[in-house]
Each structure stands twice: as structure tokens, then as C-alpha cells.
């Protein structure tokens, strides 16, 4: 595999009506019906304010595979995301450097991204806790990303 990044175009989008119906299904039920495979695992936690049972997330997944601490392709994902997309990031589960912080999340929100699911770290936790933009991650660190 060559060094660098690749972008695969033309992914199939989920029907919006189906996404809206799916959003009402509890995540535990979804996990059970997937034979408990392909779910986030015990380390994945909501990092946003979700008191009162809110803060769920459903949408077409725009997936990103990146090196720990590298958020260049996440910027690209935000640029090509359509309103309602969920950006799902696999940063290898590394929590030494964040791949998303307050500024990139605000940019994503303005662009219509529904939220993030990150196998890796975020930073600026206080900003996420003060808001309701859905972001789930496996860790928090003060160390920022690099591009």
C-alpha cells in the first residue's frame, strides 16, 4: 500500500427516512441485532452534554482511517460531508494526541455534520460538555493533533 492518503468516492448513502426511523432505536438493541459485533465497545463514551437521555446519533457514516494524532483526512471528510453525515474516525484507539478539538468540531457542525464517533482522543472537553453536538470518543487529552 502506498504511503499517503486515499479518498474513495461514491459511497452509498442511507435513505433519510430510514435514518430518522433508526434514530429512535436504542443503541443496545442495535448492538444485540448485530450479534454484538461492530459496536463501539466499553471505551467509547459520550463527550458532549447528553443529560436527560438526549445526545444520540444516527446518519450515513463517512469513515476515516488515520494515523494516531493526524487529522488531515478528517478535515477532508468535513469538506465532502453532506448534511446529516456522521464522521466515524479510526485513529487506532490512540489517546496520546487528539484528532478532534473544539474548532474542528464547530466547523463540522456549521457544515451540517451530525456528529463524530472517534476511536481515539479529543481535546477541549469543557467545550463539548457545554454543548450538545454529539461526539463520542475513547479518550481525552490536552495534546493537539498534527496534519
Listing of model-derived features with the role each one plays in the protein:
Residues 1-147:
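Feature captures the catalytic cores and cofactor-binding loops of soluble hydro-lyases/lyases
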Amino acid at each position: 500500500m502506498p504511503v499517503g492518503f486515499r479518498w474513495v468516492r461514491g459511497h452509498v448513502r442511507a435513505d433519510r427516512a430510514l435514518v430518522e426511523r433508526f434514530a429512535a432505536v436504542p443503541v443496545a438493541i442495535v448492538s444485540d441485532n448485530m450479534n454484538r459485533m461492530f459496536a463501539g465497545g466499553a471505551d467509547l463514551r459520550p463527550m458532549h452534554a447528553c443529560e436527560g437521555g438526549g445526545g444520540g446519533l444516527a446518519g450515513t457514516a463517512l469513515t476515516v482511517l488515520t494515523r494516531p494524532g493526524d487529522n488531515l483526512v478528517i478535515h477532508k471528510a468535513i469538506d465532502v460531508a453532506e448534511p446529516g453525515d456522521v464522521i466515524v474516525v479510526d485513529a487506532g484507539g490512540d489517546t496520546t494526541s487528539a484528532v478532534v478539538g473544539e474548532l474542528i468540531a464547530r466547523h463540522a457542525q456549521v457544515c451540517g455534520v451530525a456528529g463524530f464517533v472517534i476511536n481515539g482522543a479529543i481535546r477541549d472537553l469543557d467545550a463539548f460538555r457545554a454543548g450538545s453536538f454529539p461526539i463520542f470518543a475513547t479518550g481525552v487529552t490536552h495534546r493537539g493533533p498534527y496534519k
